[in-house]
Amino acid sequence: GRVLSVFHNRRWDSDFLTLKGLLAEGVLGEVAYFESHFDSFRPQVRDRWREQGGPGSGIWYDLAPHLLDQAITLFGLPVSMTVDLAQLRPGAQSTDYFHAILSYPQRRVILHGTMLAAAESARYIVHGSRGSYVKYGLDPQEERLKNGERLPQEDWGYDMRDGVLTRVEGEERVEETLLTVPGNYPAYYAAIRDALNGDGENPVPASQAIQVMELIELGIESAKHRATLCLA
């Protein structure tokens, strides 16, 4: 048989792996609030297809799939979704701002992206019944690949920006720096190898990618009608 898989590489980001480990260990307790950002500062509209208004252009199609995939990997599908999409830069022809609220029975997930953020935004803000986690900075793997670096390298995936973990112990709040575990994009390819050899599961089956696509389309409808839409 054939294996169809989708490269949702952001599941192997350093900060996401760190956060996933925290949740698996129950360090934060029950998560009530999860906020995830992909922000940048690019005030000038560039002459490239992603910004020219054609099919699939704009950051809702470009960046939101990563954030949506991470959210449903952690929490599953939401009950409903409310999305605001906009073109905020002068001359913008495609979406350069999004703000999505994914509603769960006891949780709210905020996914945000903009191209007009000169100040640094937190990558993650997570609040739970036992503590909080806040992380700044982006996983370094994409930038290193763009710079022509090749594997293997001993320091691959190391993120020099650590997060802050705040625990609640009785009446006290204890704040500590939390080391960010290394990112690991190569793990996706190792998992694909194992899946092809019949030695492991498909790391990102098509069914999971379809869920993300459905949320992308539902978000567009939500923004169009300025309404909260429930998943079927």
What are these regions (language model features)?
Residues 151, 177-179, 187, 191-232:
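C-terminal helix-rich "cap/oligomerization" subdomain common to oxidoreductases
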Residues 55-61, 174-183:
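A short glycine-threonine-serine/GTX helix/turn-capping micro-motif
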Residues 4, 34, 81, 100, ...:
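Well-ordered beta-strand positions enriched in small/hydrophobic/aromatic, beta-favoring residues
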Residues 69-153, 186-202:
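Contiguous beta-strand/loop segments that form the cofactor/metal-binding neighborhood of enzyme cores
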Residues 2-3, 10-91, 226:
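Predominantly a Rossmann-like dinucleotide-binding segment in NAD(P)-dependent oxidoreductases
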Residues 4-8, 110-112:
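Short catalytic-loop micro-motif centered on adjacent basic/acidic residues
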Residues 13-16, 67-68, 161, 185-190, ...:
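A general structural signal for well-ordered alpha-helical segments in protein cores
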Residues 8-11, 38, 115, 208:
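Structured beta->alpha junctions
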